[in-house]
Design a protein with these regions (language model features):
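C-terminal interaction surface of TIR/SEFIR-family domains
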Residues: 1-30, 75, 96-168
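Conserved BB-loop
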Residues: 23-53, 68-77, 81
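Short glycine-biased active-site loop of nucleotidyltransferases that positions the nucleotide triphosphate
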Residues: 52-56, 113-115
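An anion/phosphate-binding loop that grips the pyrophosphate of nucleotide cofactors and donors
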Residues: 59
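Inter-motif core of Ras-like GTPase G domains
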Residues: 62-63
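Flexible loop residues that form catalytic
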Residues: 67-68, 109
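Short acidic-hydrophobic sequence patches enriched in Asp/Glu that either
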Residues: 79-84, 130
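Arginine/glycine-rich "motif VI" loop of SF2 helicases in the C-terminal RecA-like domain
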Residues: 83-99
Length: 168
């Protein structure tokens, strides 16, 4: 079985944020995830919109790294983030139960996601001390390896009247 392919969508807020995203993507690759990141997969002369469209449709999952700037750009439809939002909104409308998109929070202020992701459960990576726990939750989702298996349904403890002892 091939490792899950994961496209990482983020805004280029600062050099330190880009470095965090690069380290995050490297960690995913080191733990069995085929992470796709512009910092590795794009070079001068490549077509950015084509890259985004291709990876958004080709990937098994899309991780959206939500910062204040990311949320602002997505909600306003600006830049690459706005373009990706347009593609993902269309995809989400086609399949309402789509769990392909996983928002992660990387903010210093109030945790927030773009409006179009408002119904999605997110993972909060804003506190570095909880990063291993949150990474474990994310990896379990991407690798379909839940922490707890849902138990099988047992048999009905009640028997129908016509099969029970009538003398009781």
């Amino acid at each position: 079985m091939n490792p899950p392919r994961v496209f990482i969508s983020y805004s280029h807020d600062s050099a330190s944020h880009k470095e965090w995203v690069l380290n995050f993507a490297t960690t995913l690759r080191n733990r069995g995830i085929d992470a796709v990141l512009d910092q590795w997969d794009l070079k001068p002369g490549d077509d950015l919109p084509h890259f985004m469209e291709t990876e958004l449709s080709r990937s098994d999952f899309v991780i959206m790294v939500c910062t204040e700037s990311y949320v602002e750009k997505a909600n306003a439809g600006q830049g690459g983030v706005g373009y990706e939002k347009m593609i993902m909104t269309s995809s989400l409308l086609k399949k309402i139960d789509n769990s392909k998109v996983i928002p992660i929070i990387r903010q210093t202020s109030k945790a927030d996601v773009p409006t179009f992701l408002g119904t999605k459960i997110y993972i909060d990576f804003s506190n570095d001390k909880d990063e291993e726990y949150n990474l474990d939750e994310l990896l379990r989702t991407l690798l379909n390896a839940p922490l707890f298996e849902k138990p099988q349904i047992g048999s009905n403890p009640f028997t129908p009247m016509n099969q029970s002892n009538p003398d009781r």
